[in-house]
């Protein structure tokens, strides 16, 4: 084969599965949203901190390395000292490591918030990505459930700060101790029943999806779905199933609290959990948060195994249309709970902790559905065109650009091939530039510049029928002294803003 036939293959540009590139509008929307979240957290007295993207794999807790490679659920690599590191799976486990490592220097209670990307080595799907952003808030070193109540109130305030009205969201609260008490009361206490307890938790977690009848099947012998696939159940008997369904079916906690307390009486943690729920309910009510905002709801079962007490979830209650065209409730956008065991793994002593995570991408989708995000105007930059390439001319163009920027106006000088002026105006049109600044040799000699109102010009171009009329009208273009450049640009931008406002 000749050398001519051996053409080097081009590298194929491809995005890894489960990852997305982010556009300017997405980034601005996230920045707008996180700024509002951050303001609420700051008002509550929380401080920011960051942890690295990589942690030693054993610090993540849920995903310990196997003999060859710790690849279940996390992205991992082996360092040159043969230690395994993984991209963080969430923001909570790295926080626990940070607190344990700096325990003697940290002031407890430690109130902190963090925003950042987390990574899941899982099969991607529609709306399910391997990299996504979370925004967390946590209190470390506060053993009382008043810290959990504060988290619930902060979740409610955050959603309202983002423009979500009361009635469109609900903070639902349960307690893992109560659930564990119910399981103990029906004979599922002890280490030997751990697997069966986990199956019960998974069944309860499907309540919204399958309803009480479907959950009853999953608690009992099992359930066959529409495709014929069979999911083995938890193997409970009818009496056990009735007690579990009573617990998760409680609609009015105040009416059922006494009956629930009776059910878990005599269990190691159940009674304590009921008291904690009652305390949280009293605290949030005293602070002005009624049950239409924060509600005790025993059907909340968060899947992470390290929750040890109160668990809470922020649900958006308005309807949206799913990919099948069906009306469905939007659902959960944030959740968390008490995880007294997570920091303790490093310490050998109890370290109480509670906190929650907001799913930034999911919440952003909800806010866009409500028209609460991305509404702020972002005006494209004014374009200073380039007519001459000599040093003096370039210096003038750059000076015009800097004068506009100094006045707070977005501006850029054209950086492409300046010799094709038509391409500069095409660039301005595609970029959505509101104004083009033009100065050729004649204008430079007179100390003037031409200002082309591209927005008005585009509108009028549809009304003027021929080029002769266009040239005669000289619409949307005027010549001003260099000294008046900034003031005239400001006036044109203000007029364009008025036009947009009238068009709304």
UniProtKB/Swiss-Prot annotation:
Biological process, per Gene Ontology: histidyl-tRNA aminoacylation
Subcellular location per the Swiss-Prot or TrEMBL entry: Cytoplasm
Disulfide bridges in this chain: none
InterPro entries membership: aa-tRNA-synth_II (IPR006195), aa-tRNA-synth_II/BPL/LPL (IPR045864), Anticodon-bd (IPR004154), Anticodon-bd_dom_sf (IPR036621), His-tRNA-ligase (IPR015807), HisRS-like_core (IPR041715), HisRS/HisZ (IPR004516), HisRS_anticodon (IPR033656)
GO (cellular component) term, any one: cytoplasm
Keyword Lipid biosynthesis: no
Catalytic activity: tRNA(His) + L-histidine + ATP = L-histidyl-tRNA(His) + AMP + diphosphate + H(+)
Membrane-spanning ranges: none
Similarity section: Belongs to the class-II aminoacyl-tRNA synthetase family.
PANTHER family: HISTIDINE--TRNA LIGASE (PTHR11476:SF7), HISTIDYL-TRNA SYNTHETASE (PTHR11476)
The name this protein goes by in its record: Histidine--tRNA ligase
Protein source organism: Rhizobium rhizogenes (strain K84 / ATCC BAA-868)
